[in-house]
């Protein structure tokens, strides 16, 4: 096990720098109180990088990430850069190249409802009464978003058409399936694979390989759902699911659905991993430029993203559990930021960071 870690910190735009400051408080505690040894180096990314260095992903930033064991990412984008050509906007010109460069093929999106925040869910109270804790695993580098040929054409009779190609290679499905089963072993030992194998050849291959991989994990129960049924079942009874294994397009849809039924995207972290478990860890929400600089953003998603880095990037489950426990502790005590408060008595961004940090120090 590594004893020295290097973390590249990329705060980015909008609320990114604000919530990242609260993650720094947790990093300081990990170093001083838990005696973890790591080096932290901060780099520009996104719109601020365009403004200061001319590129959304400067070479210096990419090189710094290459020398690191993990990337802790904030958020990118904002109205200032919305009139740029789409390929040059921070969201496209920073995050997608990072995913491609490091071959981050697996996106992990936890969707958990806390008992203290059940009232925020758009689902009926009897559905969320028992809570839910779903881990959506989305294949991130294959499928219809990357398949070729893809384009638009104009026929001689002036009829325009567009086309995309859904392609999956066996090795792409194999590696994401193994990861899903391995993660399920540390949870509730259930994997539900999402496909459309009654129509799509790519889904038939997906289902066949997932079934084959499942034989290596006899302690994990495997089920299959068509994407249309899965979307309905998540609304009807989310508590029946543990790990959802999804192709790229279906995972894009499912992970957002799982996020919205929790009631606040400001609570949700994510991780994108490659085969060596190198990862990029970031909040599931965006840069929220409308509230940037107001000190009202919820830092919990950024702190929980750091927890995922500790869990998967450092393989320190016990310490990650303590970070998660500190977040739960402050919620149980009634501390809220504006987005999860039902009144005007809420904490500022820095105040929420402080109470979580104090809970981590005290072991609450």
Swiss-Prot record:
CC terms in the record's Gene Ontology section: cytosol
Catalytically driven reaction(s): (2R,3S)-3-isopropylmalate + NAD(+) = 4-methyl-2-oxopentanoate + CO2 + NADH
Binding site for NAD(+): 78-91, 286-298
Pfam family, one: Iso_dh
Keyword Signal on entry: no
PROSITE patterns with a match to the protein in the record: IDH_IMDH
Domain of life: Bacteria
Similarity-based family: Belongs to the isocitrate and isopropylmalate dehydrogenases family. LeuB type 1 subfamily.
Role played: Catalyzes the oxidation of 3-carboxy-2-hydroxy-4-methylpentanoate (3-isopropylmalate) to 3-carboxy-4-methyl-2-oxopentanoate. The product decarboxylates to 4-methyl-2 oxopentanoate.
HAMAP family according to UniProt: LeuB_type1
Protein name: 3-isopropylmalate dehydrogenase
Organism name: Buchnera aphidicola subsp. Uroleucon obscurum
């Amino acid at each position: 096990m590594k004893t020295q870690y290097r973390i590249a910190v990329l705060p980015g735009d909008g609320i990114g720098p604000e919530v990242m400051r609260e993650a720094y408080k947790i990093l300081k505690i990990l170093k001083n109180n838990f005696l973890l040894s790591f080096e932290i180096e901060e780099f520009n990314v996104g719109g601020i990088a365009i403004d200061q260095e001319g590129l959304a992903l400067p070479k210096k930033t990419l090189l710094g990430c290459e020398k690191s064991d993990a990337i802790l990412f904030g958020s990118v984008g904002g109205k200032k850069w919305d009139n740029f050509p789409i390929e040059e906007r921070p969201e496209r010109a920073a995050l997608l190249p990072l995913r491609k460069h490091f071959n981050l093929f697996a996106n992990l999106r936890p969707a958990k409802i806390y008992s203290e925040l059940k009232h925020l869910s758009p689902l009926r109270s009897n559905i969320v009464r028992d809570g839910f804790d779903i881990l959506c695993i989305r294949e991130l580098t294959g499928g219809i978003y990357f398949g070729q040929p893809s384009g638009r054409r104009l026929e001689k009779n002036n009829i325009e058409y567009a086309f995309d190609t859904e392609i999956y290679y066996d090795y792409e499905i194999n590696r994401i399936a193994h990861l899903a089963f391995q993660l399920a072993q540390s949870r509730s030992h259930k994997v539900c694979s999402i496909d459309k194998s009654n129509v799509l050849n790519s889904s038939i291959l997906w289902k066949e390989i997932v079934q084959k991989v499942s034989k290596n994990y006899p302690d994990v129960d495997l089920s299959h759902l068509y994407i249309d049924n899965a979307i309905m079942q998540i609304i009807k009874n989310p508590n029946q699911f543990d790990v959802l294994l999804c192709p790229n397009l279906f995972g894009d849809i499912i992970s957002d659905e799982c996020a919205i039924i929790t009631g606040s995207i400001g609570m949700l972290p994510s991780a994108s991993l490659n085969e060596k478990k190198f990862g990029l860890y970031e909040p599931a929400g965006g840069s929220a430029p409308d509230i940037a600089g107001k000190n009202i953003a919820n830092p919990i998603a950024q702190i929980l993203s750091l927890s995922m880095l500790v869990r998967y990037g450092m393989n320190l489950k016990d310490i990650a559990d303590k970070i998660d426990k500190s977040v739960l502790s402050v919620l149980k005590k009634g501390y809220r930021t504006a987005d999860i408060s039902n009144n005007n008595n809420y904490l500022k961004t820095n105040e929420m960071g402080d109470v979580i940090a104090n809970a981590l120090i005290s072991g609450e």
